[in-house]
């Protein structure tokens, strides 16, 4: 009996030790291979290396347009790398936006291993690059995050008030979205990874656009609505259709005009639903 109990305790202990790694693999899906570059789709760009405050070199692409109406700091999702977002870069160009898109540590050509705090430091370094190296005024910046990047963008915007914030297909927090998929997992499993987007948006007063698909199969539509309801400042909700990863393409006829309209009136304070 004692031996059996000892074996059970050992197995449980090993499971507890293994859980952080399992959770990390649930959150991060990095791809190292850069499959294609902006020049492949006719976009001029500069390959940039930015050093974070903890000494990690991260890779980024600076993709300018002539006479930009604003500049985007784009925080991508948890999968792939910068080369997976060329369609998004094309959207930026059509909207007249210069952009810096960067890879989190452990993604693409960026050094290191991904972690929650690490991704925040990566976004901070990208912000510093735009405002110090490129000399772009904060009020001319749009911090834009998609999926996991929504939490990173919200946290960056909470620390650095800027012109606009766009949060697309994002969750309220990792524990809450994980519970929607794996209800039996206890909350403490995610103690190391919170990405508490809702807490960050509570601190934001700048005009913010929330974009979410009512057909999102990964992050429930309700998460986008909760983020919208949490915001205290000027805010707009843009409802689109389509899957989590393809919704912006499937809803392009609503997506681009909705973003354009938001940018045009960024100084306004209306709370509006642009589309259902």
Put a short name on every predicted segment.
Residues 248-262:
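Post-His helix in hydrolase/transferase enzymes
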Residues 214-219, 245-246:
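Acidic catalytic loop of the alpha/beta-hydrolase fold
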Residues 225-247:
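Catalytic histidine neighborhood in serine/cysteine hydrolases
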Residues 88, 197, 206, 220-229:
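Short alpha-helix in the alpha/beta-hydrolase fold that links the catalytic acid
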Residues 203-205, 210-212, 216:
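Short beta-strand/loop motif that positions the catalytic acidic residue
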Residues 126-133, 139-184:
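Primarily recognizes the serine-hydrolase "nucleophile elbow" in alpha/beta-hydrolase
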Residues 18-51, 273-275:
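An N-terminal hydrophobic leader/cap segment in hydrolases
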Residues 53-129:
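Membrane-embedded segments
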């Amino acid at each position: 009996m004692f031996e059996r109990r000892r074996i059970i305790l050992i197995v449980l202990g090993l499971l507890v030790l293994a859980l952080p790694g399992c959770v990390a693999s649930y959150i991060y899906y990095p791809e190292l291979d850069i499959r294609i570059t902006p020049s492949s789709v006719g976009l001029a760009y500069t390959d940039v290396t930015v050093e974070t405050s903890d000494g990690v070199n991260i890779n980024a692409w600076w993709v300018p347009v002539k006479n930009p109406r604003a500049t985007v700091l784009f925080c991508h999702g948890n999968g792939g790398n910068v080369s997976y977002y060329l369609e998004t870069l094309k959207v930026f160009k059509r909207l007249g936006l210069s952009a810096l898109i960067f890879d989190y540590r452990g993604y693409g050509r960026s050094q290191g291993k991904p972690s929650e705090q690490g991704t925040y430091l990566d976004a901070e370094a990208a912000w510093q690059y735009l405002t110090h190296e490129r000399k772009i005024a904060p009020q001319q910046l749009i911090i834009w995050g998609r999926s996991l990047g929504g939490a990173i963008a919200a946290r960056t915007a909470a620390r650095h008030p800027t012109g606009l914030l766009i949060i697309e297909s994002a969750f309220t927090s990792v524990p809450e979205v994980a519970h929607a998929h794996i209800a039996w997992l206890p909350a403490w499993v995610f103690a190391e990874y919170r990405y508490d987007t809702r807490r960050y948006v509570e601190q934001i007063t700048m005009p913010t656009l929330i974009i979410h698909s009512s057909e999102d199969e990964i992050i429930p539509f309700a998460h986008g609505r909760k983020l919208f309801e949490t915001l205290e400042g000027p805010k707009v909700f843009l409802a689109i259709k389509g899957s989590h990863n393809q919704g912006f393409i499937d809803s392009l006829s609503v997506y681009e005009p909705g973003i354009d309209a938001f940018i045009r009136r960024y100084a306004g304070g209306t709370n509006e639903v642009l589309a259902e």
